[in-house]
């Protein structure tokens, strides 16, 4: 219940602008300005109660409490490590980033790339902090997390051994911005150890809010040069590297002076006329050092003598700044992988940059309702969340070789908080997605889930290349104009997890979650429906010997269980007392807490209708129905509910084996009827909004 309320509150705050980089969410409710002011007024240095300087902040296994790796660690403030600590010395550069005893080189590479773009850097590392002015032992940083920017506050106590920083540190002995940034990121993810092992892409995205693509340069797509060209034009961050097959190869230099295992930045592409033929060039930068490529098109290479002198003057950069040109064909031969981080619109201010359009959805896979697994599980696949994208504007600059106009879309499916959950044994799920073209006859279908029949025998237009246990799977797709259904899923069904689905499009795209409405039109029987069997019905129960009497919840339980126990076509252990109280709440017209005969007749007709639906769904006659079948059963009963409500129902009414018995099924139906009835009575303006005082809310909630 608390989680649901928090989720609603979060959605409403986001609608008001909370979560932007200018108005970041306060992580764990900690406000930097308020806390710093309190410390300055009291004359004490900040000690973070949410991420204390203790073993649990270091880790849970290799760096866990009592482990050999943590012996001798002392937490110290920079003011205890040197006489003149500085936040940043002479600007933030790649030399400020030196790896310590933690396997987070992926994070270091991302930070190094961030230093090349000052505007993006200072979104993450606010400049309003130092060890001199207003120093109070407190610092703050901002990270993008699943659709919102989060401000993380830390104290400046850092883990040391023998007087030296244990983890990330600067080449300048008195500079601490990078070590403090690493600590803030560790806090966000639960511990320092949680940062071990990862992809540079993950850091790129958390520092920019962008969406990333990965290309294996051993199997490059034919349009890769064009993709790089467009990415640079959109202000994207591009990185490439040469894979290493073993630890001995790390830092090794090739014959032509390329460093293996290092992240290079891609900074430009150009096509030149070389000896009468077009030659594609690419410009790279090694942010880690001055070692440069010595092959074709390097600074002193003879190829420059065969192009137009004016063009040569524009492109031939002779300064030893780590930046160099090479042919695109050599690039594909020498490098192993390319990563592109496409920036979200709010990251870019220049009007010259062609910005992406962004649509973002947050969702959840819940066992028994929306965790349907991949296409290999047709019985449950259709229950996964479904999202509709409407593409009606084609790209302005169509790619060479494309015969028909198309729309370029970047799809990214990201699972949430799995790094933070490592300490409780929850690793990454294998995730993926499929995209289906929606036929014309279903283009206006938005109010309810597409069912199993839609997917039967239908092939997706495109899908993620494979299901992978990465934080995010993403791909660039080109689709003809039309409407498409995106289905994100885990590989196996019944896996709980939160996710974020992002759609980046070159032109504005309309997108929505299928079945987001919650209409309800339950079956309303009338006592006249039983007139023909009146005497037979009353003879079944001694409780109604006097037809003017009323029955309580305990009497109702005895009557109903007695009636249903006579049936031989169902397995049923009886209604519990709480379900019977819910029944009375629905039909008790005079507020006495009991049912009159006419009300009981209406209830019995409802139960008969529910039983008919239940038995239709109980295919095995086992006395339970699968929780994922509740969506279909609810629809038959008149309720078309969105994913959030379906997930709540599965959590509330399904047992640990994901079955729903008849008592739970009826309790769910009755509860839904009560809630819909209450809302409609209170929604006088019929605008879908009800306002209640606390006392009114409590009275209605306790009904």
From Swiss-Prot:
Cofactor note: Binds 2 calcium ions.
pH dependence of activity: Optimum pH is 6.
Reactions mediated catalytically: Broad endopeptidase specificity
Organism listed in the record: Mus musculus (Mouse)
Activity regulation field: The concentration of calcium for half-maximal activity is 0.3 mM. Inhibited by calpastatin and calpeptin.
Family that this chain belongs to: Belongs to the peptidase C2 family.
Expression by tissue: Predominantly expressed in the stomach. Localizes strictly to the surface mucus cells in the gastric epithelium and the mucus-secreting goblet cells in the duodenum.
Active site per UniProt: 105, 262, 286
EC number, as in UniProt: 3.4.22.53
Domain of life of the native organism: Eukaryota
Domain comment (free text): The domain III mediates oligomerization.
Chain intervals for the UniProt region annotation (Linker): 513-531
Binding residue positions for Ca(2+) 1: 588, 590, 592, 594, 599
Biological process according to GO: calcium-dependent self proteolysis
Protein name: Calpain-8
Taxonomic placement: Eukaryota, Metazoa, Chordata, Craniata, Vertebrata
GO cellular component: Golgi apparatus
Primary role: Calcium-regulated non-lysosomal thiol-protease. Involved in membrane trafficking in the gastric surface mucus cells (pit cells) and may involve the membrane trafficking of mucus cells via interactions with coat protein. Proteolytically cleaves the beta-subunit of coatomer complex.
UniProt-annotated stretches for the region Domain IV: 532-703
Cofactors that this protein relies on: Ca(2+)
Temperature-related activity annotation: Optimum temperature is 20 degrees Celsius.
One example GO MF annotation: calcium-dependent cysteine-type endopeptidase activity
InterPro entries listed in its UniProt record: C2_III (IPR033883), Calpain_cysteine_protease (IPR022684), Calpain_domain_III (IPR022682), Calpain_III (IPR022683), Calpain_III_sf (IPR036213), EF-hand-dom_pair (IPR011992), Papain-like_cys_pep_sf (IPR038765), Pept_cys_AS (IPR000169)
Domain called Calpain catalytic: residue spans: 45-344
Region (Domain III): 355-512
Alphabetical list of Gene3D superfamilies matching this protein: 2.60.120.380, Cysteine proteinases (3.90.70.10), EF-hand (1.10.238.10)
Key words of the record: Autocatalytic cleavage, Calcium, Cytoplasm, Golgi apparatus, Hydrolase, Metal-binding, Protease, Repeat, Thiol protease
């Amino acid at each position: 219940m608390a989680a649901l309320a928090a989720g609603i509150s979060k959605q409403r705050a986001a609608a008001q602008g909370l979560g932007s980089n200018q108005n970041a969410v306060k992580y764990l409710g900690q406000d930097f300005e308020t806390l710093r002011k309190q410390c300055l007024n009291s004359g004490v240095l900040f000690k973070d109660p949410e991420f204390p300087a203790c073993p649990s902040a270091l880790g849970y296994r290799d760096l866990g409490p009592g482990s050999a790796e943590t012996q001798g660690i002392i937490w110290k403030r920079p003011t205890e490590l040197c006489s003149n600590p500085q936040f940043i010395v002479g600007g933030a550069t790649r030399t400020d980033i030196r790896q310590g005893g933690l396997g987070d080189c992926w994070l270091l590479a991302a930070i190094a790339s961030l230093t090349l773009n000052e505007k993006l850097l200072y979104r993450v590392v606010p400049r309003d902090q130092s060890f001199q002015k207003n120093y109070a032992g407190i610092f703050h940083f901002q990270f993008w997390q699943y659709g919102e920017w989060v401000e993380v506050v830390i104290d400046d106590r850092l883990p040391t051994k023998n007087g030296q920083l244990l983890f990330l540190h600067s080449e300048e002995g008195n500079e601490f911005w990078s070590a403090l940034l690493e600590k803030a990121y560790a806090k966000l993810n639960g511990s320092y150890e949680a940062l071990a092992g990862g992809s540079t892409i993950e850091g790129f995205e958390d520092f920019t809010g962008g969406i990333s693509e990965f290309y294996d340069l051993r199997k490059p797509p034919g349009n890769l040069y064009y993709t790089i060209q467009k990415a640079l034009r959109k202000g994207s961050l591009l990185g490439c590297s040469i894979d290493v097959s073993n630890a001995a190869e790390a830092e090794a230099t090739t014959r032509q002076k390329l460093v293996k295992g290092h992240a290079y930045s891609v900074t430009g592409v150009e096509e030149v006329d070389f000896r009468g033929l077009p030659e594609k060039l690419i410009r790279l930068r090694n942010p880690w050092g001055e070692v440069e490529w010595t092959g074709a098109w390097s600074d002193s290479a003879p190829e420059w003598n065969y192009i137009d002198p004016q063009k040569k003057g524009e492109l031939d950069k002779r300064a030893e700044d780590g930046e160099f040109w090479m042919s695109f064909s050599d690039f594909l031969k020498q490098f192993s992988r390319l990563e592109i981080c496409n920036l979200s619109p709010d990251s870019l201010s220049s009007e010259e940059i062609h910005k992406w359009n962004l649509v973002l959805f947050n969702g959840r896979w819940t066992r028994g309702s929306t965790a349907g697994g991949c296409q290999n599980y047709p019985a449950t696949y259709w229950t996964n969340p479904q999202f509709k994208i409407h593409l009606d504007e084609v790209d302005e600059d169509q790619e060479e070789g494309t015969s028909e106009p198309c729309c370029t879309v970047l799809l990214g499916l990201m699972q949430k908080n799995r790094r933070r959950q490592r300490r409780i044994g929850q690793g990454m799920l294998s995730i993926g997605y499929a995209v289906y073209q929606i036929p014309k006859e279903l283009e206006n279908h938005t109010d309810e889930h597409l069912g199993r029949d839609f997917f039967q025998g239908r092939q997706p237009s495109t899908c993620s290349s494979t299901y992978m246990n990465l934080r995010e799977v993403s791909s660039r797709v080109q689709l003809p104009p039309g409407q498409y259904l995106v289905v994100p899923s885990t590989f196996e069904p019944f896996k709980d997890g939160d996710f974020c689905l992002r759609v980046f499009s070159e032109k504005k795209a309309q997108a929505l979650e299928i079945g987001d409405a919650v209409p309800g039109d339950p079956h309303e029987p009338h006592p006249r429906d039983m007139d023909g069997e009146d005497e037979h019905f009353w003879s079944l129960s001694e409780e109604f010997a006097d037809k003017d009497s009323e029955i309580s919840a305990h009497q109702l339980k005895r009557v109903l269980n007695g009636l249903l126990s006579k049936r031989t076509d169902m397995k049923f252990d009886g209604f519990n007392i709480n379900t019977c109280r819910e029944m009375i709440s629905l039909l008790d017209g005079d507020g006495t807490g009991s049912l009159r005969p006419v009300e009981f007749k209406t209830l019995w007709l409802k139960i008969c209708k529910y039983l008919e639906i239940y038995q239709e769904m109980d295919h095995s006659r086992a006395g339970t129905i699968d929780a994922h079948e509740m969506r279909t059963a609810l629809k038959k009963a008149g309720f078309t509910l969105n994913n959030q409500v379906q997930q709540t129902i599965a959590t509330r009414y399904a047992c640990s084996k994901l079955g729903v018995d008849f008592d739970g099924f009826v309790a769910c139906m009755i509860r839904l009827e009560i809630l819909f009835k209450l809302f409609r009575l209170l929604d006088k303006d019929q605008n879908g909004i009800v306002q209640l005082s606390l006392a009114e809310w409590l009275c209605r909630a306790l009904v």
